[in-house]
């Protein structure tokens, strides 16, 4: 299994729609101001956060149960900047829609710009033949409110191609997050 280069990422995005919308280079400025970079890097793709958020709240004092998650634990927010309360988290989604080839698995890592501020981005791997918008989780590990910027980079996706095709892909299994749109809450 080897990591894929910028050339491969560009080819797969442009010829096979692997990433839409796709930025073939690195974008570091918008409207004359510096932003958290996004687009193609040497061996990965820096994804952007869309402007749809679900901010975790303790208003209802419920127990967090991944098998029976209460949607009322979130406040919906739409905007260019999301403020995450201290020691809390928010869910968001990518601006990009992904179509992962059958021979590929991705690993997604948070950008250091956020990590150095105590904001951790968590995303599970994109499995072979998974497609959809990626649900992102931003954890604010600090005792202060933290900002997340929509339309800017937040994490980097690394693409690994296997030496042989998997026997059963995510699509073959009928994965529960296949084709997701919007911010998707836990499913069992």
From Swiss-Prot:
It comes from the Bacteria. The active site is at 137 (proton donor/acceptor). It catalyses: dCTP + H2O + H(+) = dUTP + NH4(+). Its EC number is 3.5.4.13. Keywords: Hydrolase, Nucleotide metabolism, Nucleotide-binding. The keyword Nucleotide-binding applies. PANTHER family: DCTP DEAMINASE (PTHR42680:SF3). NCBIfam families: dCTP_deam (TIGR02274). Belongs to the dCTP deaminase family. This is dCTP deaminase. It comes from Cupriavidus taiwanensis (strain DSM 17343 / BCRC 17206 / CCUG 44338 / CIP 107171 / LMG 19424 / R1) (Ralstonia taiwanensis (strain LMG 19424)).
